[in-house]
């Protein structure tokens, strides 16, 4: 079921900037987004950037010690959101960096919110070509555990996320 919700040009630009990993100057690299949260506009007709809900690569190691935990803290407890998270992880063979599309639909969200976000998900996914990993999660218990994200990224072959060794 399509909701008729549109995706703002700003959302598409952020996706394209996060997806393309070309050679950046050190200053440009610091401004690259590590994580960003999207929400519906007040009139529920447009998917937009949620103001103030982003982590820049330059924040990591400075005022953000654990980017994954900081990302989780940006999500509301009682409403749905979409997000992009640029995951840096290591498998038994190599280090990797992949974008993950997250659909956050907490159990505490209203039924109306869950329905409109679920029916609008395809609108945003169609504007994000090439995303390898999609994760729908419904509880803070699930999203708080980085092992659950690691499972989406490669299962038992993932040994660390954001430089932190995962528990087996």
From Swiss-Prot:
InterPro entries: ADF-H (IPR002108), ADF-H/Gelsolin-like_dom_sf (IPR029006), ADF/Cofilin (IPR017904). This is Cofilin-1. PROSITE patterns: ADF_H. The keyword Disulfide bond does not apply. Inactive when phosphorylated. Phosphorylation levels vary during development. Dephosphorylated by pdxp. The lineage of its organism: Eukaryota, Metazoa, Chordata, Craniata, Vertebrata. It comes from the Eukaryota. GO terms for molecular function: actin filament binding. May play a role in the regulation of cell morphology and cytoskeletal organization. Binds to F-actin and exhibits pH-sensitive F-actin depolymerizing activity. Required for formation of the cleavage furrow during cytokinesis. A motif (Nuclear localization signal) lies at residues 30-34. Belongs to the actin-binding proteins ADF family. One of its GO terms (biological process) is cytoskeleton-dependent cytokinesis. The modification N-acetylalanine is found at residue 2. Its main location: nucleus.
């Amino acid at each position: 079921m399509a909701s008729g919700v549109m995706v703002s040009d700003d959302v598409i630009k952020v996706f394209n900037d996060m997806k393309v990993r070309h050679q950046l100057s050190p200053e440009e690299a610091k401004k690259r987004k590590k994580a960003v949260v999207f929400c519906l506009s007040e009139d529920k007709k447009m998917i937009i950037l949620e103001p103030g809900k982003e982590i820049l690569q330059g924040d990591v190691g400075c005022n953000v010690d654990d980017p994954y935990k900081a990302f989780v803290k940006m999500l509301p407890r009682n409403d749905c959101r979409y997000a992009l998270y640029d995951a840096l992880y290591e498998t038994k063979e190599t280090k990797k960096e992949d974008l993950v599309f997250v659909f956050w639909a907490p159990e505490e969200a209203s039924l109306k919110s869950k329905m409109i976000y679920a029916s609008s998900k395809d609108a945003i996914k169609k504007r994000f070509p090439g995303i390898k990993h999609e994760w729908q999660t419904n509880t803070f218990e699930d999203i708080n555990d980085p092992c659950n994200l690691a499972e989406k990224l490669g299962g038992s072959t993932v040994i660390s996320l954001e430089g932190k060794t995962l528990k087996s």
